[in-house]
C-alpha cells in the first residue's frame, strides 16, 4: 500500500488545475492505481495467510455504473475485505470515514488521493445544541458526491456508523440481533448528489473467527470470511 501512495500522490498534484476533463482523467488513473493496489495486497495475503474468502456478488453489477453501498461493521478488516470483494466487479468503493482518522498519515493520504471524504460524526445532543453542525457534514458529503460523479464510483458507508461490539449493542438496546441501530445520513446525502445512482448494494460480512482486531487480521486470524451482497 505504501508503494502505491507515491505514484498516487504524484498523479494527484495536477488536480489543483481547474479543468474538468483533466480531473476526470486523473480520477480514472487514481482509481486504476487503487484497484491495482487492492489486487497486489490481496495476492500477498493469499500467499501469507492462505485466505479462504468467499465472495457472493450479484451477476448484474458492473464497473461502469454508479452505486450506493452499505454493510455491517465488525472490524477494521471489513474495509479491505470489502474492497477485495468488489474488485473488478463494481467501481472502487469510496468510504465515508470518521474525521478523527485523518490524523493517521497513511489513511489521510489514501483518502485524499482517491476522493474519499472524512465526516465529523456529531451526536444528537451536539446537533440539537448547534444545528449548524448538521449543515457542515451535509456540505462535506455533498462535495464528495459531486466528485464521485466524475467517474463511476461506489459511495460506501457503514450503516451502523461504528464497529459492532456486544457492549455497544447492549447500550443501544438495538432491536437487531447482530446490528447496531443504523445511521444512514452520509448515504442519503451522497444519493442526493449522485443522480446517476439507481442501485443500492447491501453487503454482509461474516467471519468464522471471533477475533476482530487489526492485529488479528495482520496475523491471519481472519483468513476465513464470507461476503454476501444483494441489490
Regions found by a protein language model. Name each.
Residues 102-122, 149-231:
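A cross-family acyltransferase "interaction/gating" segment
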Residues 42-45, 82, 111, 190:
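Structural element of the ATP-grasp superfamily
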Residues 9-37, 63-130:
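Catalytic core of membrane glycerolipid acyltransferases/transacylases, capturing the structured
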Residues 1-4:
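Alpha-helical bilayer-embedded segments of polytopic membrane proteins, i.e.
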Residues 40-67:
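A short, well-structured juxtamembrane/interface segment
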Amino acid at each position: 500500500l505504501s508503494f502505491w501512495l507515491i505514484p498516487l500522490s504524484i498523479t494527484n498534484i495536477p488536480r489543483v488545475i481547474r479543468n474538468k476533463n483533466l480531473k476526470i482523467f486523473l480520477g480514472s488513473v487514481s482509481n486504476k492505481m487503487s484497484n491495482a493496489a487492492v489486487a497486489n495486497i490481496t495476492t500477498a495475503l493469499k500467499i501469507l495467510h492462505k485466505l479462504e474468502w468467499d465472495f457472493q456478488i450479484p451477476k448484474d453489477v458492473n464497473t461502469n455504473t454508479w452505486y450506493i453501498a452499505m454493510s455491517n461493521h465488525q472490524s477494521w478488516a471489513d474495509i479491505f475485505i470489502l474492497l477485495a470483494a468488489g474488485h473488478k466487479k463494481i467501481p472502487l468503493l469510496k468510504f465515508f470515514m470518521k474525521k478523527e482518522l485523518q490524523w493517521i498519515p497513511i489513511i489521510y493520504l489514501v483518502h485524499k488521493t482517491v476522493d474519499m471524504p472524512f465526516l465529523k460524526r456529531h451526536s444528537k445532543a451536539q446537533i440539537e445544541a448547534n444545528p449548524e453542525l448538521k449543515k457542515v457534514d451535509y456540505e462535506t458529503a455533498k462535495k464528495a458526491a459531486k466528485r464521485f460523479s466524475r467517474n463511476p464510483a461506489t459511495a460506501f458507508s457503514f450503516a451502523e456508523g461504528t464497529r459492532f461490539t456486544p457492549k455497544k449493542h447492549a447500550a443501544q438496546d438495538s432491536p437487531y440481533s447482530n446490528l447496531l441501530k443504523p445511521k444512514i445520513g452520509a448515504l442519503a446525502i451522497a444519493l442526493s448528489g449522485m443522480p446517476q445512482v439507481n442501485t443500492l448494494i447491501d453487503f454482509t460480512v461474516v467471519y468464522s473467527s471471533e477475533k476482530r482486531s487489526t492485529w488479528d487480521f495482520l496475523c491471519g486470524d481472519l483468513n476465513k470470511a464470507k461476503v454476501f451482497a444483494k441489490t
